[in-house]
């Protein structure tokens, strides 16, 4: 079976760092998509304080990732990375389901 989502070492390290710095207990991180951007959908990453009833839970490299069922089919097989450059740092996604993305790389369509 295909992994729902995988993390690079850099992404796992950054998620662990963010959770350690957070002032309140954290169940994991939530990864999803929402409407937005010029291509139609954007990714989001946020703290997850608890697991919702139907969340898919993936544990990889010491990180707990929660994905709601509406997002699952759109990100199946994706890889989450963390990239730092001189001017910005961000989580990025390589998604085999993407059909198109915008020129700036902020949004995509499936």
UniProtKB/Swiss-Prot annotation:
Q: What cellular-component terms does GO give this entry?
A: cytoplasm
The processes (GO biological process) annotated in the record are:
iron-sulfur cluster assembly
Q: Name one GO molecular function term.
A: 2 iron, 2 sulfur cluster binding
- InterPro entries recorded for this chain? Fe-S_cluster_asmbl/transfer (IPR050322), FeS_biogenesis (IPR000361), FeS_cluster_insertion (IPR016092), FeS_cluster_insertion_CS (IPR017870), HesB-like_dom_sf (IPR035903)
The entry assigns this protein to a family as follows: Belongs to the HesB/IscA family.
| Cited PANTHER family | IRON-SULFUR CLUSTER ASSEMBLY 1 HOMOLOG, MITOCHONDRIAL (PTHR10072:SF41), IRON-SULFUR CLUSTER ASSEMBLY PROTEIN (PTHR10072)
Q: What name is this protein filed under?
A: Uncharacterized protein RP484
Species whose genome carries this gene: Rickettsia prowazekii (strain Madrid E)
Q: Taxonomy-wise, where does this protein's organism fall, top ranks first?
A: Bacteria, Pseudomonadati, Pseudomonadota, Alphaproteobacteria, Rickettsiales
